[in-house]
């Protein structure tokens, strides 16, 4: 009863105030149109362009990024449409020998490449891969030589994620990396859980798969402790951290959601690396994204590699025609729209070329409609004010 009396009194006060004569000064209302054309490089907003681990600082011209043809007939710079430059590379390339941190060598190829991006106003993003299957020796050999237990295939040695020697060396590397990249002035985000094939956290190698939860907690806690000033991300897919070497199961492992929630509680946001792949981005993944819409940022990466070995035209959606990369771009765009992603990827090679040369309308569409833009829709101000007076 006490609460009802309080509400009644408040309503009477508001009504009386509304009935009082107004002595407000004349005001003028200004209305603003949203600028949906200009690329705004807000944090976690816009397009992400990918860097090749073999590039140097002059890749802009050599890779055609400064003279990219578009589907409307214009020629543009890719960097004018991107917010972030993303490097996915190996641990071995950044620390070839123990304590040799390549990015700190200003004369190194990596340092020149990253600096060229910063010079253009782009921020950086990183994913460090240590599983070498299908790629090469991604873990530095000093880790293997120190006694880390490993899985070997085609003479490529990948340490088990739950091996104590690996964990010791990897933790030291991440701590050193964070000293230079835990910096929001130059870094947009870090992919902070990257075991398994291609660093996508599936088909993960363990000495004992019963250590899955403990190893997951160790790696996510490490990154959360080291990267305190920049956003950190983890893949949301049903096989997260799982040892299933098929990288897929129609039945979602019972611990998947709990693992992801434990990472989110540590400050992680979420990304997915198979947008547009209808056989790998299914109802479970869509529903997980829906649960976190407008609560966490979501990053998108397309799954199909349209100019390489991927046969994207066999996608179960039936929407992709062989020889038509633009069909895949449109499929990725629609899936991203459904998930309300904050950032989309231009990626590299045929992906970036087809976004611009075959689907430039979608590139501009995401600039206009994706992410966020903060502006006043209208402002009311007094028509006349006295110099030095407060305006309320």
Residue ranges and their predicted role:
Residues 1-9:
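Bacterial N-terminal signal peptides that target proteins for export
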Residues 9-18:
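Bacterial N-terminal signal peptides
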Residues 23-86, 92-99, 108-119, 123, ...:
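Non-catalytic accessory regions flanking glycosidase/transglycosidase catalytic cores in CAZymes
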Residues 27-68, 118, 189-199, 203-352:
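Catalytic-core regions of glycoside hydrolase
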Residues 74-151, 210-231:
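Aromatic-lined substrate-binding rim segments of carbohydrate-active enzymes
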Residues 105, 109, 162-173, 211-215, ...:
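Soluble or luminal CAZymes and related metallo-dependent hydrolases
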Residues 151-166, 170-209:
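Active-site groove signature of glycoside hydrolases
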Residues 326-384:
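Catalytic cores of secreted or luminal carbohydrate-active enzymes
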């Amino acid at each position: 009863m006490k609460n009802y009396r309080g509400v009644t009194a408040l309503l009477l006060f508001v009504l009386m105030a509304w009935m009082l004569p107004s002595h407000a000064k004349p005001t003028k209302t200004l209305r603003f149109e949203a600028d949906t054309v200009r690329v705004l490089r807000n944090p976690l907003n816009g397009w992400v362009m990918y860097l090749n681990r073999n590039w140097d600082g002059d890749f802009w011209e050599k890779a055609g990024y400064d003279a990219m043809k578009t589907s409307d007939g214009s020629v543009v710079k890719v960097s004018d449409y991107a917010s972030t430059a993303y490097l996915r590379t190996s641990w071995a390339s950044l620390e070839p020998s123990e304590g040799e941190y390549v990015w700190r060598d200003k004369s190194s190829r990596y340092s020149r490449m990253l600096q060229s991006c910063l010079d253009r106003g782009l921020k950086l993003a990183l994913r460090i891969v240590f599983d070498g299957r299908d790629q090469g020796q991604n873990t530095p050999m000093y880790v293997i030589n120190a006694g880390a237990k490993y899985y070997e295939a085609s003479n490529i040695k990948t340490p088990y994620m739950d091996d104590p020697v690996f964990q010791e060396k990897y933790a030291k590397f991440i701590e050193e990396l964070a000293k230079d990249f835990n910096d929001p002035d130059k870094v947009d985000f870090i992919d902070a859980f990257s075991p398994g094939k291609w660093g996508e956290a599936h088909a993960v190698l363990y000495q004992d798969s019963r250590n899955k939860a403990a190893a997951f907690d160790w790696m996510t806690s490490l990154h959360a402790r080291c990267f305190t000033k920049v956003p950190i991300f983890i893949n949301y897919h049903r096989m997260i951290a799982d040892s299933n070497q098929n990288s897929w199961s129609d039945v979602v492992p019972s611990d998947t959601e709990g693992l992801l929630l434990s990472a989110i509680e540590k400050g992680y946001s979420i990304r997915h690396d198979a947008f547009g792949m209808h056989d790998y981005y299914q109802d479970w993944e869509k529903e997980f994204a829906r649960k976190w819409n407008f609560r966490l940022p979501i990053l998108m990466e397309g799954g199909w590699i349209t100019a390489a070995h991927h046969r994207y035209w066999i996608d179960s959606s039936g929407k992709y025609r062989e020889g038509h990369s633009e069909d895949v771009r449109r499929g990725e765009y629609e899936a991203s729209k459904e998930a309300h992603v904050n950032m989309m990827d231009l990626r590299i090679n045929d992906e970036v070329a087809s976004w611009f040369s075959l689907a430039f309308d979608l590139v501009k569409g995401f600039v206009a409609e994706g992410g966020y833009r903060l502006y006043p829709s209208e402002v009311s101000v007094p028509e006349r004010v006295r110099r030095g007076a407060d305006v309320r």
